Amino acid sequence: MAKMGLKPDPATTNQTHNNAKEIRYRGVRKRPWGRYAAEIRDPGKKTRVWLGTFDTAEEAARAYDTAARDFRGAKAKTNFPTFLELSDQKVPTGFARSPSQSSTLDCASPPTLVVPSATAGNVPPQLELSLGGGGGGSCYQIPMSRPVYFLDLMGIGNVGRGQPPPVTSAFRSPVVHVATKMACGAQSDSDSSSVVDFEGGMEKRSQLLDLDLNLPPPSEQA
């Protein structure tokens, strides 16, 4: 008769596979009833400090990491790195950044304004367009080609220059009379003398100035 072999216990087989797959953490021990205990050694007192019992190995490992950072600070050896430790990790020398990331960053950055270098040949002239001037409320006066006086506007400023006036003789006589009467009225002491008389004074003044301004002035006699 062939001997029948004993079948392996399934509970023992599952426990063996679980022990093989289970990750061991620093400062964590598994209890026989399935829970996990965490403890750490105090470097100052040289004693072991009990941290507690947890349901999972990860919880016990995190409790150990917290206690290790309290005792040893940045030199502590932990099971899980913190977010700051992950961000401080440098990229290995053999690996380079992909060109797609660099191109994305370049496109996201704002364009740089390129200012051309100014030379003496292509510099445009500076135009003053402000109405108030350089400052202080002052204004600039535009220079004229030739000063214009009041007598030039009235048509009698070009007599001594040998040039005919731009106005007609009919309009010239009352203008001369008005200017003369206004000047005489300004020198008078009474207020009534400043009134210009256009009726009687015009004939008297035209008789006194019986000159044709369209002709050149007479030559001086020695």
UniProtKB/Swiss-Prot annotation:
Q: Under what name is this protein listed?
A: Ethylene-responsive transcription factor 4
Give a yes or no for keyword Cell membrane in this entry: no
For biological process, the GO terms are:
cellular response to hypoxia; ethylene-activated signaling pathway; induced systemic resistance, jasmonic acid mediated signaling pathway; negative regulation of DNA-templated transcription; negative regulation of ethylene-activated signaling pathway; response to abscisic acid; response to ethylene
SUPFAM superfamilies xrefs? DNA-binding domain
**Lineage: superkingdom:** Eukaryota
Q: Which UniProt keywords apply?
A: DNA-binding, Ethylene signaling pathway, Nucleus, Plant defense, Repressor, Transcription, Transcription regulation
**Segments of the chain annotated as binding DNA:** 24-81
Q: Where is it localised? A: Nucleus
Species for this entry? Arabidopsis thaliana
Q: Which GO terms describe its molecular function?
A: DNA-binding transcription factor activity; transcription cis-regulatory region binding
Locate the region Disordered.
Answer: 1-22
Q: Which Gene3D superfamilies match?
A: AP2/ERF domain
Comment on protein domains: Contains a slightly degenerated ERF-associated amphiphilic repression (EAR) motif, which may be involved in the activity of transcriptional repression.
Could you tell me which InterPro entries the record lists for this protein?
A: AP2/ERF_dom (IPR001471), AP2/ERF_dom_sf (IPR036955), DNA-bd_dom_sf (IPR016177)
UniProt key word Repressor: yes
The family database entries (PROSITE patterns) matched by this protein are listed as:
AP2_ERF
Q: What does this protein do?
A: Acts as a transcriptional repressor. Binds to the GCC-box pathogenesis-related promoter element. Involved in the regulation of gene expression by stress factors and by components of stress signal transduction pathways, and could also regulate other AtERFs.
Please give one Pfam family short name.
AP2
* Signals that turn on the gene: Induced by jasmonate (JA) and by Alternaria brassicicola (locally and systemically), but only slightly by ethylene. Strong induction by wounding, cold or drought stress does not require EIN2, whereas induction by NaCl does. Transcripts accumulate in cycloheximide-treated plants, a protein synthesis inhibitor. Seems to not be influenced by exogenous abscisic acid (ABA), and heat stress.
Tell me which GO cellular component terms the UniProt record holds: nuclear body; nucleus
Describe the family membership recorded for this protein in Swiss-Prot or TrEMBL. Answer: Belongs to the AP2/ERF transcription factor family. ERF subfamily.
- Gene this chain is encoded by: ERF4
Residue numbers covered by motif EAR-like (transcriptional repression): 211-217
Taking the first listed entry, what is the main subcellular location of this protein, grouped into a coarse class? nucleus
Quote the subunit structure annotation.
Interacts with SAP18.
